C-alpha cells in the first residue's frame, strides 16, 4: 500500500488447513516448549487466502503489531521470572543437599545471602511486571510504555544474574552435562 512506512504492512489470517501451509515443528522460546499452542516453524508455499482474511484493513499491520508488543514483552518477562524461580529452587536444593567443610552448602560463606537476594529480586520483578500490566489495563499501551520499558530492561538482566548465581552455586556441575 501507498503511505508512510508504518502504513505499508498488512496482516492476514491463514487457516492452518489451507493448501500450501506446512507446520515444520515447534520452536523453543527461552528453552520452553509451548507446543501445541506456542511458536511454530511454518512454511508457506504458494498459499492463497481471500482478501476478507485481512485484519483491520490494508496498511494496518503495524498498528496490530504495536497493540501486541506491550503484552508480548510482559509475557516474556513473566516466563523469564519463571526461569529465575527455577534457578532459586535449584540453588536451595543444592544448598540443602550438598556439604563442604562439614556444613551444608547453604551455610557456607555468603550463600544464604545469595539465595535471599535472588528471592528479593524475583519478588521485585513480579511487582514491576504487575505494575506494568496494571498500567496497560488502566492507561492503555501507549501511556504504559514507561512501565513496559522498565520491565523489559530490568527483568532479563536480573534473571540472568540469578541464573548465573545458580550456575556458580553448582560449581563445575553448573556447566557440565553430568548434572
Question: What role is predicted for each listed range?
Answer:
Residues 77-84, 111-114, 118-121, 151-158:
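Amphipathic alpha-helix face/heptad-repeat signature
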